[in-house]
């Protein structure tokens, strides 16, 4: 009997652990969506006209002429979801809602997010039909109990507050019709009536402002479809974190604030930089918050420059958030968010008609370039930049391109103006598993104006291509930004099938 009980306990425990490990989105709003920029927010303090009724006021900031992107300029509001406690999800009609004094078209509903933890709950208000002309719209909810006395009647009972926030703090996500966008607002219940003034206190020493621990989170999130998911490397983490830590110290110490130094953590695809500091007694955080907000755009550009994302971030979202120690949504004395979505490039290359879609064939190139010093025998100092090939599952294994079993040749996008033609000293390649060193070839260009470098005569099968190298040896008096026509440290290569009808195109970038 004891053995059966132990066995049942082990099975239940394993199931619970498996469930916990399979949660796709552990934090509100428990789905993948774009949180900023957005013209929509809610007033930070809820209005309460009577017991059990709470009203949320929408604020719409008209998009600036320079704003871009659907979420920043065109999104509507179809539904609003509140992060609530599981215990409030009871049988019966315990929540009623009005929009601008009229009952909502669809009644409020509790739900369990399909991709969130089993214990998570949201309260949904849908078919709201709000937009850029809805500034001041008011959504009011009335909380009650069912006939068994069950239900949450205050915001303190209803809302699941963010980490570190007091009870009654509510997180609300404003979803558009697609839904792609979900700006998040945090609101608090109205303050209670002030107590009668106390008698004059005895003179006491001015207390020291408690320390503020602020963290900067840089998060890279994959967006399918995806051939090569990004994996954060120690070099990228350290390079980005060092710059953020240096900026934090410079900003904080400019206010004559005690600064304890930064701690750096890299976990998964999240870079986390935290620091603690204290303002002098009575000093506001206003100026410090403004400087932190201004720094967000620069910190975002460390990973995703405004000139274009590196190739290894294609189909990824990069977000920089300022919050408390815990997770990016934790509340602290400072806050802010900046985000961008990196899309694959679309160069005017190759100059022939063929299928360029990545994974059209089984032959692919990784999105990272390697570099090393060029041959010492050259008359000029040089650097070797190499693509690394990999064999992948083709998109359509039974199609013309998917059936390709041989890599005939490769072509690289290069700047063929006369001054740049002379900057490439050689092309080189090496099959996977080959015992011989790189084989060097004189550069072979296409017709003038085609900007095409050719690496012919490969004829590799899958075993030779999986891990093979194709390289350019460039003089050090040029750089990839100029030679590869991209304005950044990114180059393009396509890989041809024997019939030249299939030529999947790939970008690769240097890493810090």
Swiss-Prot record:
Keyword entries, A-Z: Extracellular matrix, Glycoprotein, Secreted, Signal
Secretion signal span: 1-18
GO cellular component: extracellular region
Any Pfam family matching the protein: DUF3707
SS bond list: none
Glycosylation sites: 49, 96, 118, 378, 381, 403, 476
Subcellular compartments: Secreted, Extracellular space, Extracellular matrix
Superkingdom to which the source organism belongs: Eukaryota
Coiled coil residues, start to end: none
Protein task: May be involved in conversion of asexual males and females to the sexual pathway.
Protein's name in the database: Perphorin-1
Organism: Volvox carteri
Organism placement in taxonomy: Eukaryota, Viridiplantae, Chlorophyta, core chlorophytes, Chlorophyceae
